[in-house]
A protein has these predicted regions:
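Conserved FAD/dinucleotide-binding core of flavoprotein oxidoreductases
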Residues: 78-134, 156-167, 185
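Long, low-complexity C-terminal extensions of enzymes
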Residues: 178-338
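Predominantly flavin-linked oxidoreductase catalytic cores and closely associated redox partners
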Residues: 1-112, 173
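Contiguous mid-protein beta-loop-alpha structural module that forms a pocket-lining wall or clamp
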Residues: 159, 164-180, 188, 202
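FAD-binding beta-loop-beta segment adjacent to the flavin cofactor pocket
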Residues: 131-151, 156
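Extended charged low-complexity segments that act as oligomerization/scaffolding linkers
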Residues: 7, 64-67, 116-120, 179-182
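Acidic/polar loop patches that form or flank catalytic/metal-binding clefts of enzymes
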Residues: 63-67, 125-129, 184-192
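Short, conserved secondary-structure transition motifs
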Residues: 57-61, 136-140, 196-205
Length: 338
């Protein structure tokens, strides 16, 4: 028996039956429709240890405080049992600590997070509140099961070290629009299978990319980092996608562009490897035309000098000044309300 989903809604003490061709599960980690109702299997990413996160909102205490801490990038810092993030917004600073309950207790990590906040941002304990999030690492075996499609956390999640969770949500929405537009909403099972293959290939690739940030670290100063760098066997599943790829299946899917995913072919590892101080195993320059390398190097030096000169000049606004003048139109009151 095909267990298609029909929803009963409770409205004004009345039960209303709703039948639809497609239900999109946006119920977050609960995955009420995809997992709880249809029983779609959840597959964990065991090589990612972090399963908890603290978060807090730090107020700007003064104009000077805002000028000091507001900038245009998200900062990530390695911590004792995970990593901490800083996201300076217009009205506040968003901070958090992604950590693992396998290696530390809350009464250890929370004081560490509090000390970090108070030292980094010069705030007192009563000027912020800390919340907790339980992280559910992994994905469902099928994103699209019968007439239910999980998008966002209801389908899967990878910790936000590289914002890949947001990207998979974006890509699955575009993929759905593409599939539905091909034959005016008529979708077959094989098209759902192709969708699921592309979604799974993408999220697994992103999880491995994130895992390499830990695997290539040189830290061994506590149980958490020793597990990440010396104990965890990443290679057991690291290249399972290449083993599981069925050539005919990919060729069929590519004819409809349903197998197209973001770049998850691990080329990004070059930058992680270089950042960790590892010398690349081949001479990448040998593959390049010498004249091309000289041209690129000169262009980069020219650009770098121009940027440096501008940043050091009085003409360069601070990030706060730029937002105020060019985004919020110089209206301080309006800027404060947004």
């Amino acid at each position: 028996e095909i267990k298609q989903l029909a929803v009963r809604l409770i409205e004004d003490k009345r039960t209303i039956g709703v039948i639809g061709d497609l239900f999109i599960d946006c119920t977050g980690f609960s995955s009420i429709l995809l997992e709880n109702y249809l029983g779609t299997r959840f597959i964990k990413f065991d090589d990612l240890a972090n399963d908890k996160a603290f978060y807090a909102r730090i107020p700007y205490l003064s104009q000077e405080h805002r000028e000091k801490h507001m900038h245009n990038v998200t900062d990530c810092e390695a911590a004792e049992n995970g990593w901490m993030w800083t996201i300076p917004l217009w009205n506040r600073i968003g901070v958090g600590y992604c950590w693992s309950s396998r290696f530390a207790m809350e009464n250890e990590t929370k004081p560490e997070f509090e000390r970090w906040i108070e030292e980094k941002f010069d705030v007192a304990p009563g000027e912020y509140e800390i919340g907790t999030i339980d992280i559910k690492h992994g994905y469902h075996e099928k994103a699209w099961n019968l007439n239910v499609l999980g998008i966002g956390l209801s389908y899967g999640f990878v910790e936000p070290l590289e914002s890949t969770g947001l990207l998979t949500t974006h890509e699955n929405i575009l993929r759905l629009v593409d599939v539905l537009s091909r034959r005016q909403g008529y979708v077959t099972q094989i098209e759902r299978d192709w969708f699921n293959y592309a979604a799974q290939r993408e999220v697994i690739g992103f999880s491995k990319f994130v895992a390499m940030h830990y695997a290539l670290s040189m830290r061994t100063d506590n149980p958490y980092w020793r597990w990440c760098t010396q104990r965890n066997e990443y290679m057991q599943e690291q290249f399972d996608m290449s083993v599981r790829v069925v050539d005919n299946y990919e060729r069929m899917g590519s004819s409809l562009d349903l197998d197209q995913t973001m770049d998850v072919n691990m080329n990004g590892l070059n930058y992680i490897v270089a950042g960790m101080g590892v010398k690349l195993g081949r001479d990448w320059l040998n593959d390049r035309d010498p004249d091309e390398l000289v041209f690129v190097d000169n262009a980069h030096r020219t650009y770098e000098k121009e940027v440096y000169d501008f940043v050091c000049s009085e003409e360069c606004p601070s990030h706060y000044e730029y937002l105020k003048e060019y985004i919020y139109g110089g209206d301080e009151l309006r800027a404060e309300l947004i």
